[in-house]
Amino acid sequence: MSGELPPQVQNQLAQLQQVQQQAQALAQQKSQLEIMVKESDMALEELGKIDEDVTVFKNIGNLMIKAEKDTVVEDLKEKKETLDLRLQTIIRQEERIHKRFTQLQEQLKTSVGSPGMHAE
């Protein structure tokens, strides 16, 4: 055995590393989205506790602008709905990546364990 991996195994290892990087990126995105959903939930909860006549402000870029409570609540609900959809998409992508990772691991085990690999 020359110590060098066959091209097929090298390719499978590269694919496995790529899938692992994709999984890490998705996990990071998922974490950020979960934080944003939680913040939206907290804001909606606080808005639910205050009277209708209380002055409410919302952030738009670097500005804080006075707004109607109902408008702010609707905007937050829409934002949360969008975030929830994005989160569900990320979760589905994570599931697909996990399946692909498992599939590649099995292929790699088969390739490394095959008797023909050591003949080169």
For each predicted feature, which ranges?
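Amphipathic alpha-helical coiled-coil segments
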Residues: 12, 16-33, 37-40, 76-104, ...
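Short, charged, low-complexity amphipathic alpha-helix
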Residues: 1-16
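Generic alpha-helical secondary structure signal
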Residues: 7-10, 70-74
